[in-house]
């Protein structure tokens, strides 16, 4: 098992983010929204993170949310399909609600429709 989070697992360029948003394949829950592509042709998943200043004013709060999501991805990337994912944080979460955010992320990433995810076209 490889638990590293190297450069090849990140969406880095604006074009990468734009191509994922162009597919318009999104699912959302209370805290998070996940957009995904149909495939990236690389054989492994990649992730991009969006946490705006409207969500959390302080940089340390935004960094904490990104760190939680990156850590979840790092531990679960071997179970994900080879697609590009963009995770957008809708509502702020902290240490007390991070467990809920991880659970929502698992539901959104593994795409089980019975979990009550709202699909957006």
UniProtKB/Swiss-Prot annotation:
Summary of the function given for this chain in its UniProt record: RNaseP catalyzes the removal of the 5'-leader sequence from pre-tRNA to produce the mature 5'-terminus. It can also cleave other RNA substrates such as 4.5S RNA. The protein component plays an auxiliary but essential role in vivo by binding to the 5'-leader sequence and broadening the substrate specificity of the ribozyme.
UniProt EC number: 3.1.26.5
One BP annotation, GO: tRNA 5'-leader removal
GO molecular function: 3'-tRNA processing endoribonuclease activity; ribonuclease P activity; tRNA binding
Family to which the UniProt record says this protein belongs: Belongs to the RnpA family.
Subunit record text: Consists of a catalytic RNA component (M1 or rnpB) and a protein subunit.
Enzyme class: hydrolase
The protein, known as: Ribonuclease P protein component
Pfam families with a match to the protein in the record: Ribonuclease_P
Catalytic activities: Endonucleolytic cleavage of RNA, removing 5'-extranucleotides from tRNA precursor
Keyword Glycosyltransferase found: no
GO cellular component, one term: ribonuclease P complex
NCBIfam families listed in its UniProt record: rnpA
Keywords, alphabetical: Endonuclease, Hydrolase, Nuclease, RNA-binding, tRNA processing
InterPro entries to which the protein is assigned, alphabetical: Ribosomal_Su5_D2-typ_SF, Ribsml_uS5_D2-typ_fold_subgr, RNase_P, RNase_P_CS
């Amino acid at each position: 098992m490889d638990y590293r989070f190297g450069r090849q697992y990140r969406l880095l360029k604006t074009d990468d983010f734009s191509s994922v948003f162009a597919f318009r394949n999104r699912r959302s829950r209370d805290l998070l929204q996940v957009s995904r592509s149909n495939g990236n042709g690389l054989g492994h998943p990649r992730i991009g993170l969006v946490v705006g200043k409207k969500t959390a004013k302080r940089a340390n709060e935004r960094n904490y949310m990104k760190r939680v999501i990156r850590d979840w991805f790092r531990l679960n990337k071997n179970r994900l399909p080879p697609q590009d994912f963009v995770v957008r944080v809708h509502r702020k979460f902290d240490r007390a609600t991070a467990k809920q955010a991880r659970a929502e992320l698992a539901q959104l990433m593994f795409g089980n429709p019975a979990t009550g995810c709202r699909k957006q076209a």
